[in-house]
Regions:
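Conserved AdoMet
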Residues: 28-94
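A residue-level detector for conformationally permissive "hinge/kink" positions
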Residues: 15, 47, 61, 100-102
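Conserved SAM/SAH cofactor-binding pocket of Class I
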Residues: 84-131
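A short N-terminal interaction module
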Residues: 2-46
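Secondary-structure boundary/capping residues
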Residues: 27-28, 61, 101, 125
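Aromatic-enriched hydrophobic runs in primary sequence
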Residues: 21-23, 30-31, 41, 46, ...
Length: 131
């Protein structure tokens, strides 16, 4: 069976319709992300759509979140990094633009530390959480 890298428009439309019916405001964008994450596996699409329609955050469904221009891997049990948290990164950079060390305690996914390290360049990064 040939592998299709691009889902058919009807598949995208069907996924978007299901997501929209479940209350997802950006259903088309979410459908694109789910279809890309599923990589052509119809079973994976079905599982992801079911999980998203049940209310699981999109980032946990696809396994990553965009934060500070980077893809941060996420999984259940870790808070999903949110765009509004990027404000914290901006403030830290404004207060210490030449920092040589970053300490990210209770780091969760490590998004804040990773974003700071990426922005600062050569930095000594220490990130820790309870798990």
């Amino acid at each position: 069976m040939p592998h299709r890298s691009d889902p058919s428009p009807s598949s995208r439309d069907a996924v978007a319709a299901t997501l929209r019916a479940a209350g997802c405001v950006f259903a088309e964008d979410e459908a694109d992300m789910i279809l890309a994450a599923a990589d052509g596996d119809p079973g994976a699409v079905d599982r992801m759509v079911t999980r998203r329609a049940a209310g699981l955050p999109l980032e946990l469904v696809v396994g990553w979140a965009e934060f500070g221009g980077r893809r941060i891997l996420v999984e259940p049990g870790v808070f999903v990094p949110r765009r509004r948290t990027e404000f914290l990164v901006e403030q830290a950079l404004a207060l210490a633009p030449d920092a040589s060390a970053v300490v990210d305690l209770c780091c969760g996914s490590g998004a804040v530390g990773a974003a700071l390290a990426a922005a600062l360049g050569a930095v000594d990064l220490h990130a820790a959480d309870v798990d």
